């Protein structure tokens, strides 16, 4: 029995609230149950030095957690003077995931920065960030097109992500913190709208997972991502 009472293949309630902030070209508040992440997409008319004069743009991400987004307060990383390895890993994951849906040449010589700030954490912050940041990115690119700064949208697909794992011997979808902290296996899966895998990150905590367990988890991920893709579509059409 899951602590939340959900079925093994059941997502938490998911909400995507667009245009959540005033200034960013794209902004989305994404909610996976009690996990809430603010995703903003900012367009900058410059690219990294290694991309100058190459006729293409860049999409990157930054990730952070508010000091009291968890049960106990954590100092801001800026106060510590450096980012933690976990933060660097997550923001690179978000950037890689979103670039998988972008034609960088169509974007032109500019970059889009996705800032993903965790307001409240209850498991699955990186997968929520990817799912919400995609919608913010689409809104930013649509604005560029509306303003005539690009001729066509550089977005050629959809990207969403979800966590899966093995909790008390059972493969489950979309782990919250109570499950994640006790899971024998935890995996984050990034996929596109065609059912293709962009990234899988899986770790066994208690015992090594078997091939049949891996298959069960990826099948759950496919089910969950398909629902998230549809939620994104509905949000963008609203």
Swiss-Prot record:
Task: Output the GO biological process annotations, alphabetical, semicolon-separated.
Answer: rRNA catabolic process; rRNA processing; tRNA processing
Q: What class of enzyme is it?
A: transferase
Instruction: List the InterPro entries hit by this protein, alphabetically.
Output: ExoRNase_PH_dom1, ExoRNase_PH_dom2, ExoRNase_PH_dom2_sf, PNPase/RNase_PH_dom_sf, Ribosomal_Su5_D2-typ_SF, RNase_PH, RNase_PH_bac-type, RNase_PH_CS
Q: What is its EC number?
A: 2.7.7.56
Entries under SUPFAM superfamilies matching the protein: Ribonuclease PH domain 2-like, Ribosomal protein S5 domain 2-like
Q: Which UniProt keywords apply?
A: Nucleotidyltransferase, RNA-binding, rRNA processing, Transferase, tRNA processing, tRNA-binding
Q: What does it catalyze?
A: tRNA(n+1) + phosphate = tRNA(n) + a ribonucleoside 5'-diphosphate
Functionally, this protein is described as follows: Phosphorolytic 3'-5' exoribonuclease that plays an important role in tRNA 3'-end maturation. Removes nucleotide residues following the 3'-CCA terminus of tRNAs; can also add nucleotides to the ends of RNA molecules by using nucleoside diphosphates as substrates, but this may not be physiologically important. Probably plays a role in initiation of 16S rRNA degradation (leading to ribosome degradation) during starvation.
Summarize the subunit comment. Homohexameric ring arranged as a trimer of dimers.
The text of the family note is: Belongs to the RNase PH family.
- Listed name of the protein: Ribonuclease PH
Q: Which organism is it from?
A: Alkalilimnicola ehrlichii (strain ATCC BAA-1101 / DSM 17681 / MLHE-1)
């Amino acid at each position: 029995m899951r602590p939340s009472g959900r079925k093994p293949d059941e997502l938490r309630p998911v909400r995507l609230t667009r245009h959540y902030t005033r200034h960013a070209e794209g902004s989305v508040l994404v909610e996976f149950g009690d996990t809430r992440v603010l995703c903003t997409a900012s367009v900058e008319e410059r690219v990294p030095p290694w991309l100058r004069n190459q006729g293409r743009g860049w999409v990157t991400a930054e990730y952070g957690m508010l000091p009291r987004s968890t049960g106990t307060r954590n100092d801001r990383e800026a106060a510590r003077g450096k980012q933690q390895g976990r933060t660097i890993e997550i923001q690179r994951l978000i950037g890689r995931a979103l670039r998988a849906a972008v034609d960088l040449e169509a974007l032109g010589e500019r970059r889009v920065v996705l800032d993903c700030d965790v307001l409240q954490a209850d498991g699955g912050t990186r997968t929520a960030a990817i799912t919400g940041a995609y919608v913010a990115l689409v809104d930013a690119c649509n604005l560029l097109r509306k303003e005539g700064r690009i001729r066509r949208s550089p977005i050629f697909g959809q990207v969403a992500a979800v966590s899966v794992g093995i909790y008390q011997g059972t493969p489950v979808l979309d782990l919250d913190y109570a499950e994640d902290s006790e899971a024998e296996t935890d995996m984050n899966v990034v996929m596109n709208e065609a059912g293709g895998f962009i990234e899988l990150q899986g770790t066994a905590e208690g015992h090594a997972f078997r091939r049949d367990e891996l298959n069960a988890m990826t099948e759950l991920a496919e089910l969950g991502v398909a629902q998230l893709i549809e939620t994104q579509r509905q949000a963008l059409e609203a």
